[in-house]
Each structure stands twice: as C-alpha cells, then as structure tokens.
C-alpha cells in the first residue's frame, strides 16, 4: 500500500459530497467528483479489496460487515472445516493491523505501562501534523483534524506498539530499536497467535487450515493491490487531463 493512497483513504470518505483535496502548497489538484469516481471504480472492479481498504484505514463498520459476510460465503461455498470462518476473520484483523484476542492481555499491559502519561500521545500527534504539512493541509483544516483523530485511534485500538508509539525506536538521547516490536512499530500477530485465538492445536491447524489461511491472505492482498491500482490510475488520468 503506497503512502499516497493510504493518506487519501484516511482523509476522504468516498460517501461524502463535500470533499476537496489539495496538493503541496495548497493548490487544488483533485475535486470531490473525481475522488468519488475513483473510489467507485475500485469498488466495482475489486469489491473485496475496496472494503478491506475502508476497513483498514477508515474503520468503516459497513465495510467490515461486508468483509465478514464475504468470509462466511467463501467458507460455505467451498465447505471449509471447523474454525475456518473464525480463522479467516482473524486473518482480516491481521491485515487491518488489529490485535488478535491472544495478544490483548500483553498489549493492554504495555498500554497501561507506556500510555498513562499526559505526553504519551504527542508522537502520534506530531506524526499526523507532519503528514498534514507534507500534503499542504492547514493545521486547522478538517482533513488535518481527521488525521490526528485517526492517529490517536490507531494508537489506542490497533496493534501499534505502545512503547515506541509506532516509530520503531526508543530512547531520548541515543535512539535504538524498540525491543517490544523489534523496530517495526507494530505488534504484529503470528500464526501462533492465530492458532491460540481460535483454540486449535498446531497439528489440526497445519492439516486443515494452514493452506486455506495462506490462500485467503494472498487473495486479500491481491484484491487490495488491485483496488489501489484502480484508484491510482483513475486519479493520474484525472490529473493529466
């Protein structure tokens, strides 16, 4: 996922009728009708990918409901085994950077330890302000405020590492790799977190679910990549025209 498309999805609700985006220096490049059209084309050609983007970057409830119903239909159509639907929905959580149930206790402890200070959220706000500045957005604009809200929500609800607050580094004077997330900025779930969350044995998972999980995850990323490409191509065409 390119940063430009991620930012576009975060900033603009495709259902909104009053969006206008700005380029660097505040010069208008794309208008609401163009953005809405690009999103509509992505939804038409890669419906799952579109709703995954909305689920990941906008936390759209309706999009997540669509993805969950897609998983149920997928499992029903191919007659997948016990735990399949639950496992694939957790795969969606992993793709959307949400913690799995087996991670919650550890993440909750880290949040309690590192996010209690009144200054704990400053890095998230700084990151949002930097993104707004790089994209020519006024600090007091609606879009900039949306970015700040989403960065704070990511810190509180996603698998963003509470210790480094998503930067991957700790230390005030001499920076070094965060030991909690191994420098990634995310406490990413593993297959073992997935197995523990659905309460199944490793032997059962490898025999009945592993190939399904791998195939579905690949399918999701292909759909997201396809939706992103449609949005990029459409907007590039609008700009060049």
State where each predicted segment sits:
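Long, charge-rich boundary regions
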Residues: 186-241
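Short linear interaction motifs
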Residues: 142-145, 162
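Residue-level signal for well-ordered alpha-helical segments
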Residues: 138-141, 158, 197, 201
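Short Cys/His-rich "knuckle" micro-motifs
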Residues: 171-176, 188-192
């Amino acid at each position: 996922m390119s940063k430009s498309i991620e930012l576009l999805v975060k900033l603009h609700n495709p259902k909104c009728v009053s969006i206008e985006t700005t380029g660097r220096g505040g010069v208008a490049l794309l208008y609401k009708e163009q953005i809405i059209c690009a999103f509509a084309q992505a939804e038409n050609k890669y419906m799952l990918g579109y709703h995954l983007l909305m689920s990941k970057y906008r936390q759209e409830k309706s999009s997540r409901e669509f993805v969950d119903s897609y998983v149920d239909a997928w499992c029903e159509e191919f007659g997948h085994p016990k735990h399949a639907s639950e496992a694939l929905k957790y795969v969606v959580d992993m793709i959307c950077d949400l913690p799995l149930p087996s991670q919650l206790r550890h993440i909750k402890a880290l949040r309690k330890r590192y996010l209690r200070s009144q200054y704990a959220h400053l890095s998230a706000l700084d990151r949002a302000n930097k993104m707004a500045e790089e994209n020519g957005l006024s600090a007091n604009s609606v879009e900039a405020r949306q970015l700040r809200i989403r960065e704070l929500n990511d810190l509180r609800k996603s698998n963003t590492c509470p210790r480094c607050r998503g930067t991957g580094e700790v230390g005030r004077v001499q920076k070094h790799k965060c030991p909690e997330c191994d420098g990634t900025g995310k406490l990413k779930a593993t297959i073992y977190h997935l197995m523990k969350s659905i309460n199944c044995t490793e032997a059962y998972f490898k025999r009945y679910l592993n190939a399904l999980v791998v195939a579905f995850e690949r399918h999701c990323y292909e759909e997201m990549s396809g939706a992103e490409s449609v949005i990029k191509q459409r907007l590039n065409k609008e700009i060049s025209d």
